[in-house]
Structures are given as structure tokens and as C-alpha cells.
């Protein structure tokens, strides 16, 4: 039986906070309702854009529960459950499954990375997958963790039947090609950023988990649908149009930029949790200009 690998456009949604920094579940539920009726193929709770490293264990569970209930089965829910220990990851993954998550997104442990070799990562991910009631997606985010799993390690990890895909945010086209070529056909390779979605699809990726999809799900879907239809000219043109806005909500302004863009389109973004800082007025104006020029936001 083929593994239920992830396909299409997923948004790693932001976590909403009150003015004093507490979780704001009401605004989070409102955002989830919007995403549930959007063109997205799935929703990721507690990815990097969800500020998962700044959340307590109880907050993580509350967020998963609120998101699952708000979406109510209309989209698959991927829950970020990776922590530094194998035991802790298993515990959170089981809890996420009990709350109704459909997949677990497990980031690479990284704090002791000088001692983490291929054997350590294979054992970690296989142990999590053995214990997980739901399919597992490996998450590689080298820009934040400093860990870029080599293809040989990914290939061995991918042999586990309950590990169904990988989100790789590196944008390394040769690596994407090699992962697709050397992993099983029912293992999904997902682009981790919209800035290389079209090239990744051309190399055999099955979709992407994309920060930009929080504010431009239709535009991200346009790349996927044009690619599937063989309209490479439209897919490439859309890819080019999304380069600047994607940078604005990722490498250039980060989570604060994404949340500002969410506010601009009518979603609840708000401020990130400290020590992350919100945008200043000039940065916010620059995000607005970029979103308007890309057609994501109507000109004032």
C-alpha cells in the first residue's frame, strides 16, 4: 500500500498573541477558518512561522486542539512536534495525534549537532515513526538549526514506512533532484519556500510548505496548477512575480514581516513573541509596497 505522502500547497500558519504576549486562541481560530475555506491543500501548525520554539508544552497542545477543531476536517492538519529529545518528540507526536492532527512535522534535533551523525538521525526519526500513530514528515531548516541532512541520510530515513516526506527549506536544486531520484516513489519531497517552488516541482517535488501561502495561497496554487497543466510559461511567470513578496515574509523581514502582511490582507497577524521584534513603520511600508506591486494586496 502506498504511503499517504503530502501533495500540494501547505501554509505554516502564524501563532497569534495578545498585546501582553499570551496565546490569542480566538484570533487563531478566526485565521484557521479563513485557511480552511481557502485554496490550500493543508495547514501546518507550529512550523517555524508558528514560533514553536517560543511556546510552552501546554501552549502547543492548546494550539493544536484549537486548530483541529476550527478546521473540522476540511483540510489535513500537520502539527510540528519536533523537540530536542527523541522521547519528548514521541510524547508530543502522540498527543498531537490524539488531538486530531493528520501528520507530524519533525524538525531535526540540533543543539548537540557536533555529536549527531547519520546513525543518530536515522535512529531518532525511525524511533519517532515507530511510535507515531500518524505519518511523519521530516523537517530540514538549516538556516535556523545549522543541520542540513545529507541525501544519504535522507534516503535511509525515508525507508521507514511511516515516514512519508520531507520539507527541505534549503533551495538546493541538485539536492532536491537527488532526494526525489533516490527515495521511494511514495515519499513526498516538499519545497520549504515559495522562492523555489516551480524548480522543485520540475524536479519531482510533490508540493511545498510555504510561508507565503499564508497570505497568497491562490498565487502559490497558481504555480502548482499551471505546472500540472503543462503551462510552464505561466508557472514560471508566477514564480518570478512571487520572488519579492516571498523574500519579504521570509529572509528579509522574517516572521514579523509575515505577520505584518497578514494584518494587511485582513487576517490576524499581530506582533511576534519577544525576543523577536515587530516591524517598524518604514519596514511595514516596504512590505505593503512589495505586496501591492505583486498583486497580493490591492493598492490603497
Question: PLM features: what roles do these ranges have?
Answer:
Residues 130-131, 142-250:
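Catalytic alpha/beta core domains of metabolic enzymes, predominantly
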Residues 85, 193-194, 280:
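Helix N-cap/beta->alpha junction signal
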Residues 10, 28, 60, 64, ...:
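A general structural signal for well-ordered alpha-helical segments in protein cores
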Residues 8-14, 38-40, 202-205, 209-212, ...:
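C-terminal alpha-helical cap/extension of soluble enzyme domains
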Residues 25, 29-32, 151, 284, ...:
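Short, amphipathic alpha-helical "lid/cap" segments that border enzyme active or binding sites
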Residues 2-11, 16-148:
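Active-site beta->alpha loop and helix N-cap motifs at the rims of alpha/beta catalytic domains
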Residues 7, 20, 41, 46-49, ...:
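Short glycine-rich loop/turn motifs that provide flexible caps or phosphate-binding loops at active sites
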Residues 38, 62, 66-71, 95, ...:
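Alpha-helical structural signal in soluble globular domains
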Amino acid at each position: 500500500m502506498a504511503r499517504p505522502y503530502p501533495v500540494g500547497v501547505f501554509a505554516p500558519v502564524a501563532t497569534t498573541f495578545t498585546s501582553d504576549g499570551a496565546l490569542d486562541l480566538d484570533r487563531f481560530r478566526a485565521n484557521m477558518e479563513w485557511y480552511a475555506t481557502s485554496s490550500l491543500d493543508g495547514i501546518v501548525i507550529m512550523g517555524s512561522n508558528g514560533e514553536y520554539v517560543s511556546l510552552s508544552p501546554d501552549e502547543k497542545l492548546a494550539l493544536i486542539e484549537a486548530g483541529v477543531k476550527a478546521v473540522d476536517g476540511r483540510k489535513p492538519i500537520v502539527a510540528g512536534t519536533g523537540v530536542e529529545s527523541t522521547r519528548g518528540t514521541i510524547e508530543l507526536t502522540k498527543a498531537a495525534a490524539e488531538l486530531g492532527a493528520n501528520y507530524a512535522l519533525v524538525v531535526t534535533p540540533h543543539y548537540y549537532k557536533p555529536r549527531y551523525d547519520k546513525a543518530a538521525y536515522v535512529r531518532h526519526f525511525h524511533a519517532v515513526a515507530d511510535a507515531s500513530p500518524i505519518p511523519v514528515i521530516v523537517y530540514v531548516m538549516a538556516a535556523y538549526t545549522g543541520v542540513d541532512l545529507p541525501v544519504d541520510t535522507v534516503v535511509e530515513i525515508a525507508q521507514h514506512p511511516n515516514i512519508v516526506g520531507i520539507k527541505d527549506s534549503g533551495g538546493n536544486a541538485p539536492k532536491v533532484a537527488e532526494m526525489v531520484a533516490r527515495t521511494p516513489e511514495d515519499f513526498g519531497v516538499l519545497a520549504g519556500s515559495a522562492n523555489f517552488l516551480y524548480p522543485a516541482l520540475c524536479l519531482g517535488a510533490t508540493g511545498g510548505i510555504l510561508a507565503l501561502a499564508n497570505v497568497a495561497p491562490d498565487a502559490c496554487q497558481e504555480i502548482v496548477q499551471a505546472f500540472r497543466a503543462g503551462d510552464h510559461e505561466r508557472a514560471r511567470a508566477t514564480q518570478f512575480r512571487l520572488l519579492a513578496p516571498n523574500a519579504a515574509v521570509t529572509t528579509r523581514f522574517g516572521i514579523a514581516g509575515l505577520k505584518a502582511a497578514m494584518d494587511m490582507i485582513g487576517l490576524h497577524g499581530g506582533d511576534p513573541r519577544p525576543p523577536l521584534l515587530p516591524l517598524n513603520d518604514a519596514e511595514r511600508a516596504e512590505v505593503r509596497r512589495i505586496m501591492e506591486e505583486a498583486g497580493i494586496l490591492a493598492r490603497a
